[in-house]
């Protein structure tokens, strides 16, 4: 048994409404493509995001910034007909075995991630734009990171397909001219999209360590 006593951030994801997809095989391929994009962008992952069983995916990060960045990038990288829900759990973890799906892990980080994704699903019944929740300890005290996630998810949930693609492109370092060529629109139109929410999202990503705080 290999116990990791360092503080980690475990991420569990689940495709939203996957049974409504015309082709589950195509949906799974779109998910894998999105995860490849995210893993290239957030290359510091201790365990890159990867599909596990059914419609779930998992990953492990050393700090909260990268964990939360990865979750929003998955949403931006998926086709506009797909979305993903996430639970982020903080704590230690341990390797308890291995299977054809990879290492079998357990521990507080994973328990918290499971609680977090269940909470996100429950809260989305009255907060339909919510897609991400974090659990960092066993107390019931409110976590400022969840206040941030509520607003971030609501913003991204209101994006159309083009806004998601442009936002992803900005994170990847593309210029507005490049994005205009990609989308077949003017640079001015890209700038308008940027002012209509994308800029706020990018700024919030840059300030994640300050906004989210907590142990790293």
Give the positions of each predicted feature:
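Regulatory and interdomain segments flanking nucleotide-handling catalytic cores
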Residues: 1-216
């Amino acid at each position: 048994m290999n116990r990791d006593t360092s503080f980690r951030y475990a991420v569990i994801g689940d495709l939203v409404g996957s049974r409504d997809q015309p082709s589950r095989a195509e949906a799974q391929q779109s998910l894998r493509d999105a995860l490849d994009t995210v893993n290239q962008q957030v290359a510091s992952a201790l365990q890159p995001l990867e599909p596990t069983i059914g419609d779930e995916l998992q990953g492990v990060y050393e700090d909260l910034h990268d964990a939360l960045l990865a979750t929003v990038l998955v949403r931006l990288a998926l086709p506009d007909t797909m979305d993903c829900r996430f639970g982020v759990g903080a704590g230690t973890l341990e390797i308890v075995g291995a299977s054809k799906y990879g290492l079998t892990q357990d521990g507080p980080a994973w328990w918290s991630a499971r609680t977090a994704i269940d909470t996100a699903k429950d809260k989305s019944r009255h907060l339909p734009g919510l897609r991400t929740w974090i659990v960092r300890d066993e107390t019931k005290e409110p976590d400022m990171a969840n206040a941030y996630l509520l607003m971030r998810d609501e913003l991204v949930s209101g994006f159309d397909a083009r806004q998601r693609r442009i936002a992803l492109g900005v994170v990847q370092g593309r210029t507005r001219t490049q994005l205009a060529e990609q989308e077949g629109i003017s640079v001015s139109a890209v700038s308008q999209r940027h002012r209509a929410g994308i800029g706020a999202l990018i700024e919030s990503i840059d300030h994640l360590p300050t906004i989210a705080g907590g142990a790293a």
